[in-house]
Each structure stands twice: as structure tokens, then as C-alpha cells.
């Protein structure tokens, strides 16, 4: 309970700051925002923190709320895809907010490699952006999702009396080698492109072995 209380307070503060900056930078009138997505996986809150953000930010009471929990490292990318879907459906600006308090998941006394790696890789932070039907910024041209069968135990949390304990499988680098290229190609095709059309990639930095697997797979 103590860790989750820290999560709720810190995540809200970081999310509020990031949202204020995103709204200001976008120039979008707050009374035109049609939906807010709040993405997180390192703590729980009911009602979800987007309800607090709507009130603190002065967004309309009619703003659609979509909390997204449990997608972990993929949450931000998935949130961006769903936000783009909502912009298309609603025809209004949409606010996307992500916040994680990874320090609240550190397990004192847990000397497993997974706990040490997670502590080294992940930190506390928040990010926000405004998507709109029209504008001069970057455009979301498509999204793609792929579920690997029987992969539920590869990454995630184990709920313990002390809190959320990270789960990392040793198979992650091999999954990158066997699946990443085909999934990337399918994602490109879903947007009417080919993998060779991309000059740059953004990879999740899941440790040195994972980055090496990406280098091998994409000949970087």
C-alpha cells in the first residue's frame, strides 16, 4: 500500500507537468480536447489518474477517458496508436499521457538479475503529447500489433506482498532474432510501405543483449 501511495502521488505530479507543457506547446484550446488517454503499468489507481488530470487541466467534463494499464514497455507506442484512432473517430484533439514510477517497483533485498537489470534500465518519468486532426507536426500514418502465442511469461509483474516484482525471460533476445524482422515488415506493409523505406528505427533498449539482437536482425 505504501508503494502504491507513492506511485499515485508521484505519477500524478509528473503527468500533470508533462500535460501542461504539451497543451501549451500544441496551442490547442483546452475546451476542444475530446479524449484523454492515460498509460501506465507501475501502479494502480481507481478512479484512474486521468480523472484527476481532466479536472486539474481544466478539460471539458465530457472528455472521454481511456486508461491503458498493463502494456509495460509497449504502453507508450500502443497509446499513440489508440490516440490516433480516437482522433480519426472523434475529429477532435486528443491528449496522450504516460507516467511510470519504476522506483516504486524496486524490491529491497531481491538480488536476482531481473531486479538489478530493471532497476538499471528503468526510471521515473512522464511524457505527454497532443494529437489533432490537422497540424504541421509529425503524422501517424499507421500502426500494427502482433501477439506472440504463449509469451505471457516473457515479461511482466509478479504481485507479491512487497509490491510488483519484475519478470524477465532469458528468451527475449532470441525472440527479437526470430520475430522482429517479420513483424517490422508486416507493420510497414500495413501502412502501404516496405521495411526498406525506413532509414531509421527506434528500438526498445532492453539491455545489451537485446540491442545486439536488433543489430544482427536488421544488419545495423
Listing of model-derived features with the role each one plays in the protein:
Residues 39, 69, 93-100, 123, ...:
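Short beta-strand segments
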Residues 36-45, 198-214:
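Glycine-rich phosphate-binding loops at beta-strand->alpha-helix junctions
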Residues 1-8, 108-178, 182-186:
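Condensing-enzyme catalytic core mediating Claisen C-C bond formation in acyl metabolism
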Residues 30-34, 61-64, 89-94, 116-117, ...:
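Short coil/turn connectors at secondary-structure junctions
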